[in-house]
A protein has these predicted regions:
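C-terminal SET catalytic tail plus cysteine-rich post-SET Zn-binding segment of SAM-dependent SET-domain
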Residues: 2-20, 117-206
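Catalytic cores of histone-lysine modification enzymes
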Residues: 5, 11, 17-126
Length: 206
């Protein structure tokens, strides 16, 4: 299973992801349904603040260069059945990381909680938990990513208000299946979705 890994953001140790998956599958008790990973992290070059009808968002305080890490997702790994028992605010502050697994942050919002969707985002996923700037982000611009790159369920579907020319109008858990988005975000899907896309394309993957 491997030794505990070092948290990139705090220097503390956490349980390796494969250990968490094994624990969830081997022990369905309440204690096994919640496992602490890392806290959410937001670059000091950005700040979470009110964002009108979106609620809150994260905005650049200084210029962020393409390729810079801007946020890291952490929290509790839970299954969909457990996610559905949480209050709506915590459900909205979650990200899907595997077929039936989600990262949910603490009851009190953390700096990295407020990363909104955009159909033409300023950041993209690297792996399942890290966001990097997809282009240069100017002061005052919002840090966003496309939920199509991580979602495969209906837990967070909504009418989009990103305002981009490429806006899809509605964001669903099936958007990752679109050929145009698979081409646009090639290399930037959460690993479990990247594997599924590869399989659908006839590639031999795990």
């Amino acid at each position: 299973m491997g030794e505990p890994l070092l948290n990139n953001y705090t220097g503390e140790a956490h349980v390796p992801y494969d250990c968490i998956l094994a624990g969830l599958r081997a022990n369905p008790t309440r204690e096994a349904r919640f496992h602490r990973l890392d806290k959410n992290w937001l670059t000091p070059k950005a700040q979470s603040r009110p964002a009108g009808t979106k609620g809150h968002g994260s905005f650049a305080l200084e210029k962020i260069s393409r390729g810079e890490t801007v946020a890291g997702f952490g929290g509790w790994v839970v299954t969909r059945s457990t996610l559905d028992t949480l209050d709506l605010d915590r459900q909205h502050r979650s990200i899907q990381v595997d077929e039936d697994l989600y990262l949910v942050s603490d009851e009190t919002p953390e700096p990295g909680d407020h990363l909104n969707h955009s159909c033409h985002p300023s950041a993209v996923l690297i792996g399942s938990q890290v966001l990097v700037a997809w282009r240069d982000i100017e002061v005052g611009e919002e840090l966003t990513f496309d939920y199509a790159t991580c979602d495969d369920s209906d837990y967070d579907e909504f009418t989009c208000g990103c305002g981009e020319a490429q806006c899809r109008g509605t964001v669903t858990g099936q958007d990752w299946k679109r050929a145009d988005l698979q081409e646009k975000y090639k290399g930037y899907f959460s690993p479990y979705l990247a594997r599924r896309i590869a399989k659908e394309n006839g590639e031999d993957v795990l």
